[in-house]
Amino acid sequence: MSFGSEHYLCASSSYRKVFGDGSRLSSRLSGAGGSGSFRSQSLSRSNVASSAACSSASSLGLGLAYRRSPASDGLDLSQAAARTNEYKIIRTNEKEQLQGLNDRFAVFIEKVHQLETQNRALEAELAALRQRHAEPSRVGELFQRELRDLRAQLEEASSARAQALLERDGLAEEVQRLRARCEEESRGREGAERALKAQQRDVDGATLARLDLEKKVESLLDELAFVRQVHDEEVAELLATLQASSQAAAEVDVAVAKPDLSSALREIRAQYESLAAKNLQSAEEWYKSKFANLNEQAARSTEAIRASREEIHEYRRQLQARTIEIEGLRGANESLERQILELEERHSAEVASYQDNIGQLENDLRNTKSEMARHLREYQDLLNVKMALDIEIAAYRKLLEGEETRFSTSGLSISGLNPLPNPSYLLPPRILSSTTSKGSATGLSLKKEEEEEEASKIASKKTSQIGESFEEILEETVISTKKTEKSNIEETTISSQKI
């Protein structure tokens, strides 16, 4: 008894060392990766060590029992040899079992490796499918982002174009204002030139008048000298006539008329001298006044000429400044017009490139949408296949559960639980045995026929119940699959709408 218990404990301990509990075995199976062969070798070595330990323990037990044999005197050498032979057989069997278990464990590890590789491949395929499903949304986000950037650039270009147009309009208004001012200045210049010409004509007239006056003064001086000469000659003639008349009178009455003639001559001389002095003084005063007036007019004319010359010079300087400013504004306007043309050309080129990009992105979006629809159709087909498989699995599971519950509750045989509608397969073994021994007695045959009818009724009821339960299970699974399909379709439509 002690040897058997020890051997059982050693076998169980070695089995536990090999397989462990359920959780340990599952953890080892799930954690087995690329080092599966190494683990199998280590486990085989540990199993061999455990078997060696068990053999040593059993040998110790035999040794103790053999040592006890002289005390008990009940165990002989034949029994010991039989036990050693039995132990050798058990040990060889145990080694074979351990080797077989190690082989099975290696097969299980290889299968786990295969399943892990398949699982990784399926996970990679699932990740690729998810990435493909997520790519349209990413492409849509990229498309929307690029479209927003293009719209922002388009708005910036339009705002820059509007700003350039406003600047161009402002510069055009400034040019128009400067042109109007230039025309006004040119009109003022023409008026100043006309006034200058008029003043020059006045100056010329004044100079001519001065020359005429100078000539008149000269002629008057000459005339005054001639008048003086004529006056002197007349005075001389008068004196001569007076002398002649005085001589003639002297001949008549020299004594009486001599004082009267001298006084009369003195009076006449005084009158002529006073008249000549008055004429000379009046001529000098008129000449002086006329000369002063001419000098004043000449001074005024020279001042006006100088002012008009300064004004003309100022007008010329302003005109040159305005012409320079107009030329600069004209150059700025031309440069701005060139910039506007360049901006319009660049804007049109950018708009064309953006439209090309938008068309390409729309084509990519349509392609991704079509690919997404194809993937959705494939996913829907796979989902339909999965739901059909789930329906079948659920139906078989419900059938198996129903069979197990009926088998556990009732003591019927498995043949009575056959869901086939043929009643000939639903007969119990005792009915078949009774049909074979039907020719023994007529009473027994009738009784057996009644039992067969009852059994067939029971079997038909059971088959009808199984069929009803199967139909109920199918209806439940169909309803659940329809609900899941509807929810999946709604999710896919929502995701497609979001995309």
Swiss-Prot record:
Residues 409-499 are annotated as: Tail. GO terms for cellular component: cytoplasmic ribonucleoprotein granule; intermediate filament; neurofilament; postsynaptic intermediate filament cytoskeleton; Schaffer collateral - CA1 synapse. Residues 143-238 are annotated as: Coil 1B. Residues 130-142 are annotated as: Linker 1. Residues 88-129 are annotated as: Coil 1A. Disulfide bonds: none annotated. Residues 263-408 are annotated as: Coil 2. Coiled coil: none annotated. The modification Phosphoserine is found at S72, S219, S335, S469, S496. Keywords: Acetylation, Coiled coil, Developmental protein, Differentiation, Glycoprotein, Intermediate filament, Neurogenesis, Phosphoprotein. InterPro entries: IF_conserved (IPR018039), IF_rod_dom (IPR039008), Intermed_filament_DNA-bd (IPR006821), Intermediate_filament (IPR050405). Residues 432-443 have a biased composition (Polar residues). O-glycosylated. The modification N6-acetyllysine is found at K290. Residues 94-407 form the IF rod domain. Forms homodimers (in vitro). Forms heterodimers with NEFL, NEFM or NEFH (in vitro). Class-IV neuronal intermediate filament that is able to self-assemble. It is involved in the morphogenesis of neurons. It may form an independent structural network without the involvement of other neurofilaments or it may cooperate with NEFL to form the filamentous backbone to which NEFM and NEFH attach to form the cross-bridges. May also cooperate with the neuronal intermediate filament protein PRPH to form filamentous networks. This is Alpha-internexin. The gene is INA.
